Structure formats: C-alpha cells, structure tokens
C-alpha cells in the first residue's frame, strides 16, 4: 500500500468511525428511551427533555403550539385561535393512598385524593396555563426519594371549543404521555447518561479536530534528490 493511499484512507476511516459512533448512540435502546428528541409539532419544534423517561404519542397538534413533558412537569404552549382552551386530564396510577392530598384546582377548595382529575384552562396565556398545569400535576406527584417505589402518571391534553365542549377534530387527544417518576433512581440514571454523553461528544470532537488538522494543515514534502 502506497503512502498516498494511506493518507487518503486515514481521513475516510476517521469519518466512518464518527458516523458509526453517532449511529450506535442514536439506536441504542437504553439511550433512546431516556434522551428524548426534537420532534416537529403543530407549529415549531417540541423538545422532550432527555432527563425524563417517557412514552409519548402525538395524534393531533391542532390546539397546542408546543407541549413539553419533563418527569411529572407539563408545560403547555399557546393554544390555537380555533380552540383557545386546553383540557388536561391527569391519572395517577400509583397505589391508592400512597400519595399526598390532592388540591382541587377547579376553585372548590376541597381537598381530596382522586385517582383521576380533569380541569379546563379558560385562558390563552402561556404562563397561566403552565402554572395551572404544574399545580394540578404537583397535587398527584408530590416528592419522592430514592427508597420509594416508582409511580406512573398518565397525562392527556386535548383542545376544547369556545362553548366548553369538544367538537369536530378536537375530539382527538393531541397529546398522551406516560411517565414513571422515581426521583432518586432517575437522578442516578441521569448522571450516568450525562457522563456517557460527555465522553461520546469529547471523542467525536477529538476525531473531528484530528480530521480537520490532517486535511487542512499543509504537509511538508521531502524534496527528491536532483540526479544529474
């Protein structure tokens, strides 16, 4: 193998190695189930935080501009002008009586321990919608340490028409998510995943830098002896 072939094949091999690392990382089930992803929504991009483990499905994004789920925190974006109100249903599937007292956000002021709760946000304010949703979900979630069992919270978000009833296309649930929350265990997984990501990114940057230097830095060529 000539020196010219070696100089040509080394950058190609480095590039193939970088692509293989990226492909393995993207297809690894352990990472794929934790990291989340960028996904096109009704308008703009939806970022699902990779620190939360979830199983999400989008059927209809007509009423929400963006929906983001991070653990048990749900942040709803601006509703569309056609269906300005957002209906959120939260179901806590943990063992009965294991959670804290849930506060009814509908305005009755009564404290109860429901398994399923439903609330309609009559607002177009992103901040108000987010705060109300966080308050509702916090009533089910509480705070957990590493020794406590995991619990599952199912969250459904759907648009509501002006008259307060679902009609037409709004009958379809645009966002359905299931997330298992155990704070201590998740924190351990998150730290491990971040470490693996940092190592992978460092290796990728190093290989890319070597490739750039190899291709861009001029090489000193030895002069051939002059033969008379």
Curated annotation (Swiss-Prot):
Domain of life of the organism encoding this protein: Viruses
Compositional bias (Polar residues): 78-97
Residues annotated as signal peptide: 1-26
Main location (coarse class): host cell
Keywords of this entry: Glycoprotein, Host membrane, Membrane, Signal, Transmembrane, Transmembrane helix
Membrane topology type: Single-pass type I membrane protein
Residue intervals passing through the bilayer: 197-217
Subcellular location: Host membrane
A GO cellular component annotation in the UniProt record: host cell membrane
Positions annotated with a glycan in the UniProt record: 55, 60, 70, 85
Residue segments, region Disordered: 77-113
Disulfide-bond pairs as recorded: none
Protein name: Protein K8.1
């Amino acid at each position: 193998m000539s020196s010219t072939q070696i100089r040509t094949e080394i950058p190609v091999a480095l590039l193939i190695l970088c692509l293989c690392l990226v492909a393995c990382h993207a297809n690894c089930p352990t990472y794929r189930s934790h990291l989340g992803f960028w996904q096109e929504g009704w308008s703009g991009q939806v970022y699902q935080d990779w620190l939360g483990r979830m199983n999400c499905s989008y059927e209809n994004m007509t009423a929400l501009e963006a929906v983001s789920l991070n653990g048990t925190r749900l942040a709803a974006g601006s509703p569309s002008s056609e269906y300005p109100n957002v209906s959120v249903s939260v179901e806590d599937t943990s063992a009965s009586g294991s959670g804290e007292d849930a506060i009814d956000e509908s305005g009755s002021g009564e404290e109860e321990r429901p398994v399923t709760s439903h609330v309609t946000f009559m607002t177009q304010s992103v901040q108000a919608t987010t705060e109300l949703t966080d308050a509702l979900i916090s009533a089910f979630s509480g705070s957990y340490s590493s020794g406590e069992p995991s619990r599952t919270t199912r969250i459904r978000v759907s648009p509501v028409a002006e008259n307060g009833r679902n009609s037409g296309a709004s009958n379809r649930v645009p966002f359905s998510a299931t997330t298992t929350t155990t704070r201590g265990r998740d924190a351990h997984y998150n730290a491990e995943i971040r470490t693996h990501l940092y190592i992978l990114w460092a290796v990728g940057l190093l290989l890319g830098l070597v490739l750039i230097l190899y291709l861009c830095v001029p090489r000193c060529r030895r002069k051939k002896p002059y033969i008379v």
